[in-house]
Swiss-Prot record:
It comes from Androctonus crassicauda (Arabian fat-tailed scorpion). Transmembrane segments: none annotated. It comes from the Eukaryota. This is Toxin Acra II-2. It is found in: Secreted. GO terms for molecular function: sodium channel inhibitor activity; toxin activity. Expressed by the venom gland. Keywords: Disulfide bond, Ion channel impairing toxin, Neurotoxin, Secreted, Toxin, Voltage-gated sodium channel impairing toxin.
């Protein structure tokens, strides 16, 4: 079964590059920043399972999930 998801984008609007394919601690952390629990390295970029389009940009994800009230 294919799990939906997206490639998250960093502050420059680029995908997160990764070198260790599959299980990847860096990608898991990236995906948590974007508001989802799990992700891995696929085709040299981090992929996040269940990442919705509204949270693909790290700026949007930060606004949606950051607890810091600055800028709200």
């Amino acid at each position: 079964a294919d799990v939906p998801g997206n490639y998250p984008l960093n502050t420059n609007g680029n995908m997160y590059y990764c070198t260790i394919l599959g299980e990847n601690e860096f990608c898991r952390k990236v995906c948590k920043v974007h508001g989802v629990k799990y992700g891995y390295c696929f085709n040299s970029h981090c992929w996040c399972e269940y990442l919705e389009a509204k949270d693909v940009s790290v700026w949007n994800a930060a606004k949606n999930y950051c607890k810091n009230p600055v800028g709200k």
